[in-house]
């Protein structure tokens, strides 16, 4: 391969890579594949991308480098032919609640620009178009009235204010005005006008009374000028008497001039407004709603100029949840309010007692037996003042009249005003995020939401699925001026929306919080953004872009990757998806297995080369030499079932779902069809509410039945098992407790009186204090990356010399942490409690990982399997429900085979497993399928079919069934 057309890697030894030498073609779509933990990410991200990023950063000044997070130099001899590198992975999803799909893709920035420059402001109260008008424009509008129309010009000086307004009326007389209109009635100022003090009044000066005719303009301009001066820029044209109009199709015909006008084809007016309101200000003439001059910042929820004043642009507020404050409605009133049921609550008891006296309930009455009104009074307070009697906070006997603020408001005040972290922490468990009442979750202030472009405000474009947003943008009803101003912004918005459609994200909305996106969705959004940038000559490194994507949408993703390549870029894609592997220009298979058994280039070349390679596990499954067998029989389950009724959250359309227990159940459907909503946002919280009462029951779920068949619910996801190097597989699974106990039984440990704490690297005693048990010391280098230096005292062993002198079968505690699971299984083969947990790690395919491997270095798939192993080693109750969201993420065909064996074992032990999955191997091996659809977003949310894989495969309208039928036949 010519040097200039290739990326040449020599001596790559990062992590488990074994001195890899590799030449990769430029401007091609390259797929790195292999089993989980084989070294794919180590080569793609930690070597190739890291070196490309490091070289770019090193080209900057030392001053600039101190502001950039730098990557360490990877362990590689050389990389030649490297282009500027951009990483698109799953780990960099924003956790900022202010970040949305619109802001990440920058579409929202263009929308802000568009509305700020071409928008049309309206009154937030009456939706009247707000625009400043000159006197000439006002005069022209009045002169459009039919001839002989009688009208009067009014200057509103008081709008709905209480008072007698004696001074104002006296002032008007002295200025020479004759009449005023008060509360809709015209009165002479010479009359003795007496207004009620406690009543709201509207007062308008009658400036002039006129009849529309030719030659009226000069007097009209003078009168309007006087009116605008008196009413601070506002004028009202009150139509007093409409002229008789001629209508040729029928009606009055006694006006000869009108008839003549009609016969000559001149315009005539069938309807006239009762009033015409003018304003020379940027304000609503009726409600006085003032609009600042439009600018993009008015539409930014991250700016004080545009953000909702109550939620500050987040869209939700943190407030106390009634379901958490009253977790058990069976309890009597005096202990039902959980935060008040703890010790020293006599003050609150006296409040409740007084409320009971006034509103006729007993403190011993169960909460659920109170009337709706009584419950609302206790929670939200009273408008009227009532008599309270009892001890004050300071133990003084007293009585007084006052309003009761309500338990929720009292708790909120206590939380907001306390300086005690302990009190805040205690109250936090009763607080949830709830949509802001002021903006309804729209994030913006009313003035911003009242600005329209064509027929839509900005929320009308961001709150609907992207597919619908594009339709609305293309059908905007714009004036020629608006179209000219917005031409470039509209072009950019349409292009970026189309890119999102191309990667299968048509069901998302632009106002969707980025923190709620799955890893696959976030990655495809960044992929769409990169296509929009139009860069060429770039090296893109992607991590499984097909995650969370239904088989139906794969072709759209592949077309996007091809488009990015055809722009003149090189793509390295870490992927396990068969369609992507087949579509690749060049394939690199890394393995043959994981960890110390991997790190080699097993195969490189095209798809046919991969199929023929006898060492490649990927090739073995793709060629059919290895296969995951479809179960011959489907389980009947244990007869129990969970039934969710009235599911209407997000896009779910008030569906009823039945989940059989004692089975492996798959929830399937295209991306955005409602799978995660059903399982993660309805089923899981409902189960938590039932089991612990520490989570509110989902508002958009009618009811759930069959809960007595479940005593534990466990979510197994791909989040890290720990955030620090102190956490590792040994500590997470509990193996380390057994190992430390074993070491205390040695002769040396007994002689020294060592307890299990001596062998912990987290507490003082046996650990090395020079590095606090970490094995390394961190040295901050300012504009260079932090350097991790092996501890000089313990040489990375984590323990002090005395602890390391204690040996079991010739191995110190540090030696054991450095062992792989397989090696440890041999060492502790005679210790049943250790063997049980170690064997489950081997069974889930993690025989290669070290017991002390820091948690942050584990892949998502590895972390998930550590959790599965931990669950497998526990004694089964037969009433546990496992919820697993896309467990095949990051797993090869070989790993999926292992995973399925583990899931089947969990079910065989009497448990129930519910999986959200797109992988057809997992779906066809399940006992029951619940398929949602038919499409994503607002076109999804229905149950297409529920039944065995064979039943689903026969359904004519199910996309899942269509692809499932093919694999079942093969």
Swiss-Prot record:
Taxonomic superkingdom: Bacteria
InterPro entries reported in the protein's UniProt record: ABC_transporter-like_ATP-bd, ABC_transporter-like_CS, ATP_grasp_subdomain_1, P-loop_NTPase, UvrA, UvrA_DNA-bd, UvrA_inter
Gene3D superfamilies, A to Z: ABC transporter ATPase domain-like, ABC transporter ATPase like domain, ATP-grasp fold, A domain, P-loop containing nucleotide triphosphate hydrolases
The keyword Plastid belongs to this UniProt entry's keyword annotation: no
Single GO molecular function: zinc ion binding
Gene Ontology CC entries for this record: cytoplasm; excinuclease repair complex
Subcellular compartments: Cytoplasm
Keywords, in A-Z order: ATP-binding, Cytoplasm, DNA damage, DNA excision, DNA repair, DNA-binding, Excision nuclease, Metal-binding, Nucleotide-binding, Repeat, Zinc, Zinc-finger
Record's function text: The UvrABC repair system catalyzes the recognition and processing of DNA lesions. UvrA is an ATPase and a DNA-binding protein. A damage recognition complex composed of 2 UvrA and 2 UvrB subunits scans DNA for abnormalities. When the presence of a lesion has been verified by UvrB, the UvrA molecules dissociate.
Subunit organization: Forms a heterotetramer with UvrB during the search for lesions.
Note: This bacterium is considerably more resistant to UV and gamma irradiation than E.coli; the E.coli-like SOS regulon model is not an appropriate model for DNA repair in this cyanobacterium.
Protein name: UvrABC system protein A
Species of provenance: Synechocystis sp. (strain ATCC 27184 / PCC 6803 / Kazusa)
């Amino acid at each position: 391969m010519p040097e200039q057309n290739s990326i040449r890697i020599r001596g790559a030894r990062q992590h488990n890579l074994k001195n890899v030498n590799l030449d990769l073609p430029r401007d091609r779509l390259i797929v790195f594949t292999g089993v989980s933990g084989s070294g794919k990410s180590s080569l793609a991200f930690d070597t190739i991308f890291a070196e490309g990023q490091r070289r770019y950063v090193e080209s900057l000044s030392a001053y600039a480098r101190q502001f950039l997070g730098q990557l360490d130099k990877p362990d590689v001899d050389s990389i030649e032919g490297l282009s500027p590198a951009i990483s698109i992975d799953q780990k960099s999803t924003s956790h900022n609640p202010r970040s949305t799909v619109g802001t990440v893709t920058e579409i929202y920035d263009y929308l802000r620009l568009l509305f700020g420059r071409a928008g049309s402001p309206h009154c937030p109260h009456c939706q009247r178009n707000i625009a400043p008008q000159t006197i000439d424009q006002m005069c022209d509008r009045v002169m459009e009235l039919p001839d002989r129309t009688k009208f009067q010009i009014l200057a509103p000086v008081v709008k709905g204010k209480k008072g007698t307004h004696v001074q104002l009326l006296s002032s008007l007389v002295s200025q020479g005005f004759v009449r005023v209109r008060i509360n809709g009635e015209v009165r002479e100022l010479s009359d003795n006008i007496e207004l009620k003090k406690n009543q709201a009044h509207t007062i308008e000066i009658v400036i002039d009374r006129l009849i529309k005719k030719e030659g009226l303009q000069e007097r009209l301009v003078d009168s309007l000028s006087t009116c605008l001066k008196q009413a601070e820029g506002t004028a009202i044209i009150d139509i007093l008497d409409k002229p008789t109009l001629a209508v040729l199709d029928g009606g009055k015909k006694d006006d000869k001039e009108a008839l003549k006008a009609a016969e000559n084809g001149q315009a005539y007016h069938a309807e006239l407004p009762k009033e015409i309101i003018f304003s020379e200000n940027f304000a609503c003439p009726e409600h006085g709603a003032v609009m600042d001059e439009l600018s993009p910042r008015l539409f930014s929820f991250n700016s004080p100029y545009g953000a909702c004043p109550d939620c500050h642009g987040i869209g939700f507020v943190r407030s106390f949840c009634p379901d958490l404050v009253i977790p058990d409605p069976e309890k009597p009133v005096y202990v039902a309010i959980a935060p008040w049921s703890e010790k020293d609550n006599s003050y609150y008891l006296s409040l409740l007692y007084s409320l009971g006296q006034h509103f006729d309930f007993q403190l011993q009455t169960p909460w659920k037996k109170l009337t709706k009104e009584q419950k609302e009074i206790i929670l939200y307070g009273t408008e009227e003042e009532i008599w309270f009697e009892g001890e004050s906070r300071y133990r003084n006997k007293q009585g007084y009249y006052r309003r009761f603020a309500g338990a929720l408001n009292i708790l909120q005040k206590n939380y907001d005003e306390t300086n005690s972290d302990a009190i805040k922490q205690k109250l936090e468990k009763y607080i949830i995020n709830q949509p802001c009442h002021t903006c309804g979750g729209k994030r913006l202030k009313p003035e911003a939401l009242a600005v329209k472009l064509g027929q839509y405000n900005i929320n009308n474009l961001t709150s609907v699925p992207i597919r619908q947003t594009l339709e609305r943008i293309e059908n905007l009803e714009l004036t020629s001026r608006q179209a000219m101003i917005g031409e470039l912004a509209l072009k950019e918005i349409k292009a970026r929306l189309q890119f999102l459609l191309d990667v299968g994200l048509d069901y998302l909305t632009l106002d969707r919080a980025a923190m709620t996106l799955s890893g696959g969705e976030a990655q495809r959004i960044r992929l769409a953004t990169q296509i929009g940038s139009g860069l060429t000559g770039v090296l893109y490194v992607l991590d499984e872009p097909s995650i969370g994507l239904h088989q139906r949408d794969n072709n759209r993703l592949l077309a996007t990757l091809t488009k990015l390549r055809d722009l003149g870029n090189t793509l390295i894609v870490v992927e396990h998806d068969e369609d992507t592997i087949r579509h690749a220009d060049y394939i690199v298979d890394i393995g043959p297995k994981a960890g110390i058994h991997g790190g080699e280039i097993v195969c490189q070349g095209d798809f046919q080369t991969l199929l023929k390679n006898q060492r490649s596990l990927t090739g073995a499954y793709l060629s059919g030499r290895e296969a995951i067998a479809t179960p011959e029989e489907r389980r009947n389950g244990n007869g129990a079932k969970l039934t969710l009724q009235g599911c209407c959250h997000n896009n779910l359309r008030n569906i009823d779902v039945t989940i059989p227990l004692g089975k492996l159940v798959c929830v399937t459907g295209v991306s955005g069809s409602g799978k995660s909503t059903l399982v993660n946002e309805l089923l899981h919280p409902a189960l938590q509410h039932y089991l612990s009462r520490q989570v509110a029951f989902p508002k958009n779920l009618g009811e759930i039945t069959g809960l007595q068949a479940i005593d534990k619910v466990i979510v197994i996801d791909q989040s890290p098992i720990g955030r620090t190097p102190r956490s590792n597989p040994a500590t997470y699974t509990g193996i380390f407790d057994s190992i430390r106990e074993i070491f205390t039984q040695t002769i040396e440990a007994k002689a020294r009186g060592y307890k299990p704490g001596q062998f912990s690297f987290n507490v003082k005693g046996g650990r090395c204090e020079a590095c606090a048990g970490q094995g390394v010391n961190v040295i901050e280098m300012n504009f260079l990356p932090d350097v991790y230096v092996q501890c000089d005292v313990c040489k990375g062993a984590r323990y002090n010399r005395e602890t390391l002198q204690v040996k079991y079968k010739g191995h110190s505690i540090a030696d054991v942490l450095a062992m792989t699971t397989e090696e440890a299984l041999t060492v502790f083969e005679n210790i049943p409690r250790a063997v049980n947990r170690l064997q489950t790690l081997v069974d889930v395919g993690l025989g290669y990982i070290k017991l002390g491997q820091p948690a942050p270095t584990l892949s998502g798939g590895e972390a998930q399997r550590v959790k599965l192993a931990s669950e497998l080693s526990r004694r089964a109750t037969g009433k546990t429900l496992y919820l697993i969201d896309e467990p095949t993420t990051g797993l090869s065909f070989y790993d999926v085979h292992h995973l399925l064996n583990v899931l089947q074992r969990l079910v065989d032990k009497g448990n129930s497993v519910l999986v959200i999955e797109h992988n057809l191997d997992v779906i066809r091996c399940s006992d029951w399928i619940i398929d949602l659809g038919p499409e994503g977003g607002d076109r999804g949310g229905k149950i297409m079919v529920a039944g065995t894989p064979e039943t689903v495969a026969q359904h004519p309208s199910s996309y899942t069934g269509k692809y499932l039928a093919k694999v079942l036949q093969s």
